[in-house]
Amino acid sequence: MPPYTIVYFPVRGRCEAMRILLADQGQSWKEEVITGETWGKGSLKSTCLYGQLPKFEDGDLTLYQSNAILRHLGRSLGLYGKDQREAALVDMVNDGVEDLRCKYVTLIYTKYEEGKDDYVKALPGHLKPFETLLSKNQGGKAFIVGDQISFADYNLLDLLLIHQVLAPGCLDNFPLLSAYVARLSARPKIKAFLSSPDHVNRPINGNGKQ
């Protein structure tokens, strides 16, 4: 039986980064898919610590909060930088990813039609910090921090991929980010996952947007 279980809705949402991570690291996991109807009944929600999903199980350890799950996997699988300095930078990057993801989620679920144009116009300003970080690390030809992949790379990759769906061409003026996405997406296990039916057929969000 796989050591990990992801309990989540039938969307990519806040779990696709951890799925990409697990796939790239050669880990197996079980999916427990929760439909909106099941969630609406309230019995599962009442058992969730914060009343929300995802819920993640690693043996007898149960975790909530997607970024806590990513950090746990980072520590468990050696994806948290090579020292405390790099770990601090990985945390910083991941917090930046979360900031932009929250903006994206707000757009998708509260003001998509009326807010998309303004969001896309502001997007370059939100992407620039990641381009800057890449430029300061081996000329942008490695990972976002150091010379080994971290959980923040997987989270950033997922964030950039969904923004390419939202705004095709959004990375055209960010050559390092564009090359970064291509480079990570070409890693054999990530490439296989991104082309798998599980990923391709899973909607990004739960309301039909993207």
Curated annotation (Swiss-Prot):
Biological-process GO terms, alphabetical: glutathione derivative biosynthetic process; glutathione metabolic process; hepoxilin biosynthetic process; prostaglandin metabolic process
InterPro entries the record matches: Glutathione-S-Trfase_C-like (IPR010987), Glutathione-S-Trfase_C_sf (IPR036282), Glutathione_S-Trfase (IPR040079), Glutathione_S-Trfase_N (IPR004045), GST_C (IPR004046), GST_pi (IPR003082), GST_superfamily (IPR050213), Thioredoxin-like_sf (IPR036249)
Q: Which residues carry this modification: Phosphothreonine?
A: T62
Tell me any Pfam family this protein matches. GST_C_3
Q: Which residues form the signal peptide?
A: none
Which residues are recorded as modified (Phosphotyrosine)?
A: Y4
The record's section on PROSITE patterns has:
GST_CTER, GST_NTER
Entry keyword set? Acetylation, Cytoplasm, Lipid metabolism, Mitochondrion, Nucleus, Phosphoprotein, Transferase
Q: Which GO terms describe its cellular component?
A: cytosol; mitochondrion; nucleus
Please name every pair of cysteines joined by a disulfide bond in this record. Answer: none
**Cellular location(s):** Cytoplasm; Mitochondrion; Nucleus
Q: What is its EC number?
A: 2.5.1.18
**N6-succinyllysine: residues bearing it:** K103, K116
Q: Where is the GST N-terminal domain?
A: 2-81
Reactions performed catalytically: RX + glutathione = an S-substituted glutathione + a halide anion + H(+); prostaglandin J2 + glutathione = prostaglandin J2-S-(R)-glutathione; prostaglandin J2 + glutathione = prostaglandin J2-S-(S)-glutathione; prostaglandin A2 + glutathione = prostaglandin A2-S-(S)-glutathione
Q: Which residues bind glutathione?
A: Y8, R14, W39, K45, Q52, L53, Q65, S66
Protein's job: Conjugation of reduced glutathione to a wide number of exogenous and endogenous hydrophobic electrophiles. Involved in the formation of glutathione conjugates of both prostaglandin A2 (PGA2) and prostaglandin J2 (PGJ2). Participates in the formation of novel hepoxilin regioisomers. Negatively regulates CDK5 activity via p25/p35 translocation to prevent neurodegeneration.
User: PANTHER family, alphabetically?
Assistant: GLUTATHIONE S-TRANSFERASE (PTHR11571), GLUTATHIONE S-TRANSFERASE P (PTHR11571:SF255)
Q: How does it assemble?
A: Homodimer. Interacts with CDK5.
User: What protein name is recorded for this chain?
Assistant: Glutathione S-transferase P
Which organism is the protein's source?
Nothocricetulus migratorius (Gray dwarf hamster)
